[in-house]
C-alpha cells in the first residue's frame, strides 16, 4: 500500500503518506538505495528503504492531500475539521450555488491546512478555511508559499487562494467575476500561477477565456491564449470538441505554456509571442485527462494518452520541443 507519494526537491528521496489502521503516517524513502537493490535484483521489504517521520494527530483534523516545500522541510497537508456552529452557518451561507444544469459534486466542508516538520514529525496549524480545500501546491522556488483551491467539483465564487506557511498571508488569488469559471491552477514558476478560465459553455464565451497567468507579486493578470472554440459550431450536442482549454502548465522559464483541450488535443503556446503549435491530437481524455507538463529544463512536454488503447488505459507520452523557437 504505497499511499500518496511526493518526490523530494533536493535529494533522491520520496515522501510517502499511508493510512495504517487509524493512523495517518508519513515516511521518507531512500530511492538511491532502492534502485541500487533493483539493479542487483535483490529488493527488500519497504522497511529496508523507508524511515518513519511522524503520525498526524487526530485532533488536528482529518488529513487529505499534501505538497512538500521547496526545501523539503515541511509537508503542507489539507484537512477536514469539525469547527464551530458559527463557522458551519457562515460556510453554508457563503457556499456556491451552481447553475440549474450544474450538479453539486463536492459539498462544502470546514477545512484547513496544517504543516508537518519532515525532520521531527511535529504538526502545527497554518490556516483554517470555511470551504472544501484541495489541489494544494507549494512553490518549487520560494519557501513557505502555498496555492490551493475551493474544491466544488465545478465552478466556485472564488476558486484560487494563496497563503504563507506561517499563516500571516491568506487571500484570494485572482478575484473572479460571475462569468469566470476558473480551474486547474498550477504553481508553475517562481512568480506566476497559470490557470484556465473555461469557455466550454455558450454563456462563458461572452468574455475572454483560455490559459491565463497571474503575477503573485503584483496581482497583474495576462491572457496567454485560447484555441478550438470555432469548432463548437460544428459539434454534435454532447461532444467535447470545440470547448477550448481544460488543463494547463508552463515551463519554469515562462517561455512556454501548454494546455489540453476538451477535444483531447495538446497545444503549445509561446508566452512571449502568442504563437500556437498543435502538438498532439486524439488523446481520448479517458480514462483520465492529458494533463500536460514540462520537464524541468523546459525542452520536453509530458502527457497522458488513451489514444493507443481506445481510452481503456493510459500511456505516458513525451514530445521533444527543443527545436521550437
Task: Please place each PLM-identified region on the residue numbering.
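Conserved beta-propeller blade repeats
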Residues: 1-17, 53-75, 130-149, 177-196, ...
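Beta-strand C-termini and the immediately following turn/loop, strongest in propeller blades
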Residues: 15-21, 29-31, 76-82, 104-107, ...
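Loop-centered beta-sheet repeat module
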Residues: 125-170
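Blade-level signature of beta-propeller repeat domains, shared across WD40, Kelch, NHL, RCC1
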Residues: 289-325
Amino acid at each position: 500500500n504505497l499511499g500518496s507519494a511526493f518526490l523530494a526537491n533536493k535529494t533522491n528521496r520520496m515522501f510517502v503518506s499511508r493510512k495504517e489502521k487509524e493512523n495517518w503516517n508519513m515516511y521518507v524513502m531512500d530511492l538511491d538505495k532502492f534502485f541500487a537493490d533493483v539493479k542487483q535484483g535483490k529488493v527488500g521489504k519497504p522497511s529496508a528503504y523507508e524511515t518513519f517521520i511522524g503520525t498526524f494527530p487526530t485532533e488536528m483534523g482529518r488529513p487529505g492531500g499534501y505538497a512538500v516545500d521547496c526545501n523539503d522541510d515541511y509537508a503542507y497537508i489539507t484537512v477536514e475539521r469539525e469547527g464551530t456552529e458559527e463557522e458551519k452557518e457562515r460556510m453554508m451561507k457563503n457556499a456556491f450555488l451552481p447553475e440549474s444544469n450544474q450538479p453539486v459534486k463536492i459539498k462544502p466542508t470546514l477545512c484547513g491546512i496544517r504543516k508537518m516538520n519532515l525532520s521531527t514529525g511535529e504538526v502545527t496549524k497554518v490556516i483554517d478555511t470555511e470551504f472544501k480545500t484541495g489541489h494544494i501546491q507549494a512553490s518549487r522556488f520560494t519557501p513557505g508559499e502555498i496555492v490551493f483551491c475551493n474544491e466544488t467539483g465545478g465552478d466556485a465564487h472564488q476558486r484560487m487562494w494563496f497563503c504563507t506557511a506561517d499563516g500571516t498571508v491568506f487571500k484570494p488569488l485572482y478575484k473572479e467575476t460571475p462569468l469566470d469559471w476558473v480551474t486547474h491552477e498550477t504553481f508553475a514558476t517562481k512568480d506566476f500561477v497559470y490557470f484556465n478560465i473555461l469557455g466550454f459553455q455558450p454563456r462563458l464565451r461572452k468574455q475572454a477565456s483560455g490559459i491565463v497567468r497571474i503575477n503573485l507579486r503584483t496581482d497583474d493578470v495576462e491572457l496567454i491564449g485560447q484555441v478550438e472554440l470555432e469548432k463548437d459550431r460544428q459539434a454534435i450536442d454532447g461532444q467535447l470538441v470545440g470547448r477550448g482549454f481544460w488543463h494547463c502548465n508552463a515551463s519554469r522559464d515562462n517561455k512556454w505554456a501548454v494546455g489540453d483541450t476538451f477535444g483531447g488535443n495538446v497545444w503549445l503556446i509561446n508566452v512571449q509571442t502568442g504563437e500556437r503549435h498543435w502538438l498532439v491530437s486524439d488523446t481520448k481524455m479517458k480514462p483520465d485527462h492529458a494533463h500536460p507538463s514540462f520537464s524541468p529544463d523546459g525542452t520536453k512536454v509530458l502527457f497522458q494518452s488513451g489514444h493507443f488503447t481506445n481510452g481503456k488505459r493510459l500511456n505516458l507520452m513525451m514530445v521533444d520541443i527543443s527545436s521550437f523557437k
